């Protein structure tokens, strides 16, 4: 049975494909989920792919993933810039966590330049559109192999 990676998605990502496609691209979250599941299969993982607009739900899922998954890829969306709760939840997790963003957060508005969760994760991938998810899966593959 393959190991599982959780791919968690924060607020407004359910609107991908119609929300600011010039910034976030034209792929829907369902398109990205299909890409992730296909790539993960090639890497030897299963993917548990989830999205919520609610911070507490994301925190609950981080705790769950810390118990069930070998790694976590998270696109915290706007919560990445504000959530101390998610930062603290990630600190309590022993499996590797990779933060990702579709857009280059450092090339956008000043308030998006700082990530509250970045100090708690293994690494951050941003600016590659939907490919950011694939890069995060590869990073997690590398991190899980190193821990063996």
From Swiss-Prot:
Function: Catalyzes a trans-dehydration via an enolate intermediate.
Known partners and oligomeric status: Homododecamer.
Signal peptide: none
Domain of life from the UniProt record: Bacteria
EC number(s) on file: 4.2.1.10
Reactions that this protein is recorded to catalyse: 3-dehydroquinate = 3-dehydroshikimate + H2O
Recorded family membership: Belongs to the type-II 3-dehydroquinase family.
Record GO terms (molecular function): 3-dehydroquinate dehydratase activity
UniProt keyword terms in alphabetical order: Amino-acid biosynthesis, Aromatic amino acid biosynthesis, Lyase
Active-site residues, Swiss-Prot/TrEMBL: 24, 101
Lineage: Bacteria, Pseudomonadati, Pseudomonadota, Alphaproteobacteria, Hyphomicrobiales
Binding site for substrate: 75, 81, 88, 102-103, 112
Pathway: Metabolic intermediate biosynthesis; chorismate biosynthesis; chorismate from D-erythrose 4-phosphate and phosphoenolpyruvate: step 3/7
Protein name: 3-dehydroquinate dehydratase
Listed Pfam families: DHquinase_II
Site, as annotated: Transition state stabilizer: 19
BP GO annotations: amino acid biosynthetic process; aromatic amino acid family biosynthetic process; chorismate biosynthetic process; quinate catabolic process
NCBIfam families according to UniProt: aroQ (TIGR01088), PRK05395.1-2 (NF003805), PRK05395.1-3 (NF003806), PRK05395.1-4 (NF003807)
